[in-house]
């Protein structure tokens, strides 16, 4: 069975949980790993990420709080900033307002990260599996329309049902005007690139890693 449930409210987790945060963390995360990072250590808050950096000087800090890059961070939660960054062999400390909060709530099962940029890779990885939960991250003040549109796309694809990808991607593009936090044109274009990457990040034993 494939379900969709709000990551901020759900308590009934599945064998496979797929976190969705289109604008921007589940787009940025696969981009980070595609740039050669060893792994990502996720944090629910900025202070914890900074403390980790103090103990591990070579760590690269990436993330945002309410859409703004925190002081002392190396990069924003921005796929456009990361897409050409040299992260080869680096350990990343990452935090975001929505996606990492939802990650902290999931208590069982495998945890994957998906967006438009790795949609086909995600489908290939989990197609045919039972007990899948697609988890829109949404926002503290309510639903994120773009996350829920993509969640429906992913569910339909996994169920083998027909849908118009172009129409749905355009609907996601249109939601940009209604997002709480402004998104740069450069970030938006990367967030909307279907199948840009082949990797499906997975959270394993405190780290987000590329296809284990």
UniProtKB/Swiss-Prot annotation:
Catalysis performed (reactions): (2R)-O-phospho-3-sulfolactate + H2O = (2R)-3-sulfolactate + phosphate
Gene Ontology MF terms in the entry: 2-phosphosulfolactate phosphatase activity; magnesium ion binding; sulfopyruvate decarboxylase activity
Cofactor list: Mg(2+)
EC number: 3.1.3.71
Keywords in alphabetical order: Hydrolase, Magnesium
InterPro entries noted in UniProt: ComB-like, ComB-like_sf
Enzyme class, spelled out: hydrolase
PANTHER family per the UniProt record, alphabetical: 2-PHOSPHOSULFOLACTATE PHOSPHATASE-RELATED
Family: Belongs to the ComB family.
Protein name, per record: Probable 2-phosphosulfolactate phosphatase
Lineage: Archaea, Methanobacteriati, Thermoplasmatota, Thermoplasmata, Thermoplasmatales
Gene that encodes the chain: comB
């Amino acid at each position: 069975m494939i379900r969709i449930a709000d990551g901020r409210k759900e308590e009934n987790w599945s064998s496979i949980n797929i976190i969705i945060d289109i604008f921007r963390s589940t787009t940025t995360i696969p981009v980070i790993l595609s740039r050669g990072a060893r792994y990502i250590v996720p944090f629910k808050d900025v202070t914890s990420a900074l403390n980790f950096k103090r103990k591990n000087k070579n760590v690269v800090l990436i993330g945002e709080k309410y859409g703004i890059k925190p002081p002392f961070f190396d990069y924003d939660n921005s796929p456009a900033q990361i897409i050409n960054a040299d992260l080869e062999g680096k350990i990343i400390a990452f935090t975001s307002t929505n996606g990492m909060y939802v990650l902290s709530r999931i208590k069982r099962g495998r945890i994957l990260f998906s967006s438009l940029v790795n949609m086909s890779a995600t489908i290939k990885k989990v197609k045919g599996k039972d007990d899948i939960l697609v988890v829109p991250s949404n926002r503290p003040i309510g639903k994120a329309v773009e996350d829920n549109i993509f969640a429906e796309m992913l569910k339909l694809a996994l169920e083998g049902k027909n849908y118009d990808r172009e129409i749905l991607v355009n609907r996601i593009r249109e939601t940009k005007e209604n997002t709480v936090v402004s998104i740069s044109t450069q970030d938006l274009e990367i967030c909307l690139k279907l199948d840009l990457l082949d990797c499906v990040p997975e959270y394993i034993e405190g780290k987000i890693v590329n296809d284990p």
